[in-house]
Amino acid sequence: AELPDNRYLFRYYIHDPWWLNSPWLDRYGREPHDIYLPMSVSRIDREGNIGLPTHLNFLSIDDTYGNMPTQVPDEVTPHILKARYDAPTAPGPLVWVYPFDEYHDWAINSPGRLPEVYYGDWFIRQAINNGVPLNTVTSTTSFQSAIEKKPELFRESVLITIVPDQGTSLEKRLIAFVKNGGKLIVFGPADHAS
């Protein structure tokens, strides 16, 4: 959701030199779901731009025995290219507005709110594990900046985020978003809400 710059990577294990297996051939069963699903993920920065992985790492070129079978790159490469070709160009149906700065502030200044941090991350993790089609993330800070610069950016999306604290700029932006026809799901404790 927040990065010091625009770089983030997609890493995929085609071979494993440390354990006696080649994930593409053995664990993945030559099925590309672990390529297409992660490569459909995007982040939205403060300018409202869609960010995709800037680096693709493939580990490793050789298998446990030091062999470099051409079958694996021959089969994997077309899926990587297709996933990149079909990469997101707009926010997804659901956009996770991740409270990066809020969680950081709570961890430092309000240790009593640490359970909320864990709850928020675990709630979304479990939702994804249960099939919620979440592929887009932005931070609360980036959301507030992006919506100012591109008011229609999230028009086709449902935002999902924590219940904002009373009187915060996030609360005001989310209320304005909903009043202007935006769709929003909030979750978590409402102890500090309006």
Model regions and ranges:
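Helical hinge/lid and interdomain linker segments adjacent to catalytic or ligand-binding clefts
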Residues: 114-194
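Hydrophobic targeting/anchoring helices
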Residues: 1-115
